């Protein structure tokens, strides 16, 4: 069944406007944004024409600068190339790539022809990639060459009829291409040049140069599916979040309202990955809509942060708490001048008021006239849905909702709103809320609810409170989920993998504090009789995880016990393990009471 035939919720427009305590911070026009009935591609193209920034640099990649004119020309060529290979409106094409020009050009080209981009982490395990290709009936695959060693084993089990191979070197300057090939590229296993199942990027683009069989651009409406991003939800069972053209365009209009000081002279370090809503929407689409420059960083190394800031002098920093921890702990940042920084936005996880103060002091001591603004969002609502305000900042909060977004705090499991400053479940209503989960009506109906006001509300599963002015304070996750460096890690998924080992009888995974990643996974394991904790067993468990899990999901600690604590109904009591772990760490830090 085509994605265009699936049943989705229609979310543009409200039955009745919810109350908004924060409305005084916006104008009446800002509170009622108009989402155009066009594609993401067309919206960005219109912005480039209106703003007349055709000669501005759109993308920079290892010194290669691509102007907006060149960018749109490349998108057009790529769109024709996809058409020449049989891709049509509603087809799903998977992009398995880091932040490269080719991946971004592919995203907009697919959107131009009405196809749907399925964004997948290139470091996903072989089985995860196979499941992503199978589940979404992927017609074509755009994959980095570093993934070939995994995809070559699985493509025969999918519907993929052609794979386009891209490389980190494709858009590098010539001297850097040579250096890359000599130092790294030669190590990467690649398909043969003339393999019918594979095509290299330049050959692919040439296929579309003379394509004139039919029109390339499709008339695409705002409620048409545009992109699939991924979340494991509370259980770790992979779910495809289907976002529409209207979702993305609404998010961009909101960003232009809230971050209205951004101009075509600005630039951002695109460190957040494009397979993440935060990266694709905020760091790429939103920034390009301002006519500003996106500096693509395919692989981020915290130890080289100072070099990136010194070389590129970005005016916008967007990232997860891990990024800003790296900023303040890098010893080589001592003499780096940050006076060019205008906006610093953190999302993906929360920062305490003390940590925000520390980061702000660091920024000010290095010449920046900006404070860190903390936001909150969900991939199910594209990315950020609220943000602390530059002119009315309240550190420690996640700010107020973006214009035309509505947030209310309800008693969990109901649509009954709680009082001012009371804790409850955070619910979201507005034009960025997803169409639904791909081919998963049950999960969709659990996440999206029609409340008494007749509007569709997204239940976040997160606990928060709201003050009298509409500022929201995030408290904790209802979900049993670990966030490591901004990535969602699902304990149940890890447990399922570990319990496949013949020696394991019980397993429970919790998140434990980490100085840079915020949290990492720790696995508690009970072994069957006759098995012992040995280096060989630990190695086998690690290899099992590597084969079946993304790198960021692999536990950093294993602890073996004779048995694991149980609840009254016989389930492993992970909360007890969390408590024990917290007490042990406190004891290490402060000594026994």
Predicted region positions:
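AMP-binding/adenylate-forming catalytic domain of the ANL superfamily
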Residues: 166, 547-572, 590-593
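Conserved structural elements of the adenylate-forming
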Residues: 72-77, 205-211, 222, 241-261, ...
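Gly/Ser/Thr-rich phosphate-binding loop
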Residues: 314-319, 328-395, 406
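Conserved AMP-binding/adenylate-forming core of the ANL superfamily
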Residues: 35-36, 55-86, 92-100, 104-108, ...
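Conserved beta-loop-beta connector loops within the AMP-binding
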Residues: 408-427, 450, 466-469, 532-538, ...
